[in-house]
Amino acid sequence: MVLIAVASLVTTGGCITSGHLDGLGDMYTAASITDSQLKELSRQMRAEGDAQNEVADANSKYAKRLARLTDRFRKEDGLDLNFKVYMSKTVNANATADGSIRVYSALMDMMTDNELLFIIGHEIGHVKDGDSLDKIRMAYASSGAIKAASASSAGGNLVLGRSDLQGLLHKVLNAQFSQKQESDADAYGYRLMRKYKFDTKAAVAALEKLNRLGSSGGVMASHPNSGSRASAIQAMIDRDGK
């Protein structure tokens, strides 16, 4: 559809500036990028993010705890997932399209194991449902990186410099999910807890804790409305009888 729109604008002879054509060209380029290319770009982007953050040492209590909780999930639901801890006072967790899930130490400090498992399940849901892929596609389409990547792509992969990767990561991690995406990811996390026979009440407790943080940034910036989400999970528990 985008290609047809570009062609019709070119042939009408109307007052179409080169800037408008460049923008439409960018839209077409972004739309033509494959999921596998975006996942590879996401992997590069996440590697840059790991380099910019303090990743917990494998022998630290945080890394050991996360590994204990997540080893069973590395191939969950046909996905290829990896998990790391960022040592940070920010309460946060996020996932990117390549299957990288990052949990911040401050979040781990405030959550029990079962509560943390729900948060992790929620993030896995964003990967499985394609929400993380949607985020990077939109961020890529709206960033200057699209020209840099198009100009330097080789062998089918998109190649970006560090500054472009950092800018793309910032856009991706700070973009809000829709209410439906959040609800679906919550439901996924809840189902995952039931699958492994974890205490589902911990999902409600986790969301209530996040809700008490208010709009203080971190996880609340991209995952809002935790209060109503807690009520929705409680309704699922009541429906299922446990």
Regions found by a protein language model. Give the residues of each.
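Bacterial N-terminal signal peptides that target proteins for export
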Residues: M1-V2
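A Zn2+-metalloprotease active-site environment signal
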Residues: S8, G14-K242
